Amino acid sequence: MKTKIFNTFSISVKAKKIISVYSEIELLQSWQKASAKDPVLFLGSGSNTLFLENYQGTIILNRIKGFHVKENNFFWNIHVCSGELWHNIVTICVNKGISGLENLSWIPGYTGAAPIQNIGAYGVEFKQVCSYVDFIFLETGEKVRLSSQECNFGYRKSIFNSSKKFFNYAIVAIGLKLKKKWKACLNYTDLSFLEKEYVSPKKIYNKIFYIRKEKIPNPVYFGNAGSFFKNPLISSKQAKKILKNYPKAPCFKQLNGNVKFSAGWIIEACGLKGYKLGKAAVYHKQASIIINTGSATGYEIAYLAKYIFCIVKKNFSIQLEPEVKFISKIGEIKASKIIS
């Protein structure tokens, strides 16, 4: 009997089998047993995943729990197991007076996914608070710890999703290092009006809740994965051409000379805000989000993403890259095979 897969896109898909694991040993044994005969996929909350069709294998849900804090005069050092919900960890820290994670609040998903894509929001990235990542090579059972520097973090990437070495592995814990000498990060436009003299981690946390509530639809009503595309990084030369025609386009200069543009703004500038294709649509409040308006299939969502990709490439000579992982019947596939 196949089991229904929960995913925030609300795509109706099933897997051959779904297993929840609560310890490293259980995770390793479950993978070794299942992988002997079927494809295996690790899944958190299904919040950044697009299932194109039913999955013909076993899904393992990592639910390994644990949260431990050590501190000194300068830092909070926190060890978090990968089966903890990321937002719950942020909430616990804010409520305990531990600062540094508040800009990363209300991000769905489990902690184990945070380092893979180097999650980021409102001016802060995971790499800025990461001390280490613990993972297991599943074929050998070897447990390894990488420092933050060894993880090779970049914009929405890390060694875990950009190196062929990391194929059969599972993240089991992360380390966070948070400065006690707190400085508010208010670089993001919607946070910039907060008064620095009176701002606190709790105020930032609460403000981000209202921002996200306004911009991101509730998956209960409209299935979605938040921002579907990464904000593109382009050369300064190409950026100048765009800014000549759109002088108010939101963009941010990077240390390496490139310029980051808002994917949502680019999509909206192409006239695609609110555009519908079957049961899939570009969200009318935030063009970077693709929603399931009812009973869309995974392929309908993907076809809309492909249409957006083509229009943006035609109008701006920019190739958008999905943040969302595409899952076929036997596992993850490159999004470029579907949308480009």
UniProtKB/Swiss-Prot annotation:
The keyword Ribonucleoprotein does not apply. Its EC number is 1.3.1.98. Pathway: Cell wall biogenesis; peptidoglycan biosynthesis. GO terms for cellular component: cytosol. It comes from the Bacteria. It catalyses: UDP-N-acetyl-alpha-D-muramate + NADP(+) = UDP-N-acetyl-3-O-(1-carboxyvinyl)-alpha-D-glucosamine + NADPH + H(+). The active site is at R156, S227, E323. It is found in: Cytoplasm. Its cofactor is FAD. SUPFAM superfamilies: FAD-binding/transporter-associated domain-like, Uridine diphospho-N-Acetylenolpyruvylglucosamine reductase, MurB, C-terminal domain. The keyword Transmembrane does not apply. Pfam families: FAD_binding_4 (PF01565), MurB_C (PF02873). Keywords: Cell cycle, Cell division, Cell shape, Cell wall biogenesis/degradation, Cytoplasm, FAD, Flavoprotein, NADP, Oxidoreductase, Peptidoglycan synthesis. Belongs to the MurB family. This is UDP-N-acetylenolpyruvoylglucosamine reductase. It comes from Wigglesworthia glossinidia brevipalpis.
